[in-house]
């Protein structure tokens, strides 16, 4: 006869009827009753009650307090004289950020927690829910780290076969790599599942919290703590942006997302992520504090998750293989964090000092010289012909000069 949609009740019957709807309060002491008398409703919705009024007394909707529709095409919306807990949630949809907004609002209302604690609890709950996907990704990355030397050998053979144009050797190398993946039960695509899912979750939380802070939702202006009492405004001391960037850097150095710091990462990628973490406060300093109430606990969870998964006994119970201590990357030089950071700083200050930039410049210069040599083949050929002719003429002259004279008897 009716269905609950988002924050309201939608009546779908096409005839006049009488409905009594009872909503039981959280503490079970009092009952809210909505009673209607033989009146057709096309769409009936009511706002959720505020946190302080969730155990209020009996609410009755009478004909005197509600304007009923004159035709079936009209919509009747009854809004009680109670403050809205969130005007953002007035329309429900199945988009990820709207689902998160409704979930956060429900958790805040029925738990009684302040907004900062509700957002942090939701962040931890989401990370626990994503942990099975992360565990699958960690197993795949650990197995790939173990078989990486063999795969690198086959890949070198494959690259040589491509350069030589040997199709048979290429087929053999690819089949050997595929068999190596099948024997070890490894699918490299599993490495993308957790980052993609976490990326979608982070973007959804970011958009949901940014929208709620932009309204702002009731309770956001005083739902924080200490110097960050207003969650709709950025951190005035910029402590959370800096601490969040340092936590991300700590996760990269410890390998928290892979469960082990023994899994090798290319130096260029590590430098890039280090620079991104150190530069992140410049881009996040104007974010509202509601976003950091999700982001900061999520990074703290990652640190504890990495420490939890570095234990050999826990890895054995979870079925995670042990990664060898030394997993070298071919043609890579392991550099310390201080050296890589100083390289980045000198590369920004003085052009050409950054090692990777100098390598790229050398490669481009080499390509330019090759293209210039290829563009002038006729001149080179004429020069070589001229040199050969001159050499031949000089040889003929020398032979004629050095020809021994015959003595007459």
Swiss-Prot record:
The residues on the Mitochondrial intermembrane side of the membrane are 97-114, 210-235, 297-409
* Topological domain spans for side Mitochondrial matrix: 136-188, 257-275
Protein topology in the membrane: Multi-pass membrane protein
Q: Which InterPro entries match?
A: YidC/ALB3/OXA1/COX18, YidC/Oxa/ALB_C
List the subcellular locations: Mitochondrion inner membrane
Annotated GO MF terms: membrane insertase activity
Q: Where is the composition biased (Polar residues)?
A: 374-403
Q: Which domain of life is it from?
A: Eukaryota
* Pfam families for this protein: 60KD_IMP
Q: Which UniProt keywords apply?
A: Membrane, Mitochondrion, Mitochondrion inner membrane, Transit peptide, Transmembrane, Transmembrane helix
Known CDD domains for this protein?
5TM_Oxa1-like (cd20069)
- GO biological processes: protein insertion into mitochondrial inner membrane from matrix
- Give positions of region: Disordered: 369-409
Query: Where, by residue number, does the polypeptide cross the bilayer?
Result: 76-96, 115-135, 189-209, 236-256, 276-296
UniProt keyword Transit peptide, yes or no: yes
Q: Which GO terms describe its cellular component?
A: mitochondrial inner membrane; mitochondrion
Q: Which family does it belong to?
A: Belongs to the OXA1/ALB3/YidC family.
Its function, per the record, reads:
Required for the insertion of integral membrane proteins into the mitochondrial inner membrane. Essential for the activity and assembly of cytochrome c oxidase. It is essential for viability while oxa101 is not. When both are deleted the cell is non-viable, suggesting that oxa101 act as a back-up for oxa102.
This protein is called what? Mitochondrial inner membrane protein oxa1-2
Which organism was this protein described from?
Answer: Schizosaccharomyces pombe (strain 972 / ATCC 24843)
Upper lineage ranks? Eukaryota, Fungi, Dikarya, Ascomycota, Taphrinomycotina
Query: What gene does the UniProt entry assign to this protein?
Result: oxa102
